[in-house]
């Protein structure tokens, strides 16, 4: 089982979630530049990432090899209009999805971590690498939010 991954996700949700809750609604809505995402949209993108990876992680438990479609992040963010949603609502959804992902990855058998997964046209990667990549992606975008832009 991959409890180290789950623990890392829980730690991120706890520490970053507390910081994000201090961000005022108007600050979360402000775009740093016309072509960039506001904090709400960056966090919404992380909701989309959690939702896509939830499906990938569960399906990996049920199969021997997987091919997943890629997702077009800008279109997902635009379609869901995260900028018009409440900061608290997006934050609650992000927190809940990631707590569940932590619960899920805690239960992935070690033997499944070497399973090959393909996402779109990207080269295959193991489930373990996919989980690690998810965590790096999460940390990267949370740092963007903290720095004030996307």
Identify what each model region corresponds to.
Residues 1-6:
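Terminal targeting/low-complexity segments that flank the catalytic cores of oxidoreductases
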Residues 8-13, 17-22, 77-114:
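Acidic/histidine-rich alpha-helical segments that form the ligand environment
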